[in-house]
């Protein structure tokens, strides 16, 4: 009998597409050639941003403007950039009451005050409970800054936030003037019989949602590629504190070539 470790969000090593990535590497090097002497820039390799946009369109029905996409070294770098640039020490951040330990560690490092919101293990974060918390803060003249949520296959419960709850969450964000950071790290590994509901980013009409995704869960954490999507002016605000001169163009080009041939 095989042992299966549920402690880390990693694909099965036996499914890693080594041969296809070797082919993608050859194509990427051939296409990039001498351009690899240049820095990729804050937004990252355009070919991978185009793939991110196309993959989002396949699932959500609308493309992402590639100038709103920034490639990062995994989704944790995305979260670090977003939270570091939108929050100040002492800010109140709302999260699901059970949440990924890496995000908690980052929020603690930034000296924020974390408030957990009740959720159930099927439909996700409870918007009624969230509203009660927000009304209580409002009565004390306290204003939370943002809510961090994992709507698809929430870690650790596996809950999928229903469409109704997603819409309520956006309404509450508008009413109480909150940002939403949508961590969609597990959205690509859905095996439920019905399609998962539309992303908060797609449903958002008031520029409150910043979308985060990763290639770690569908390809491999060692690839270290993720991305965030933010509309103006927040895309520039978030990238303002970025000093790495961009994520590896070579790694990005290899993954882009791979997914162009393997979008399904």
Identify the role of each PLM range.
Residues 35-176, 187-206:
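Conserved core of the PLP fold type I
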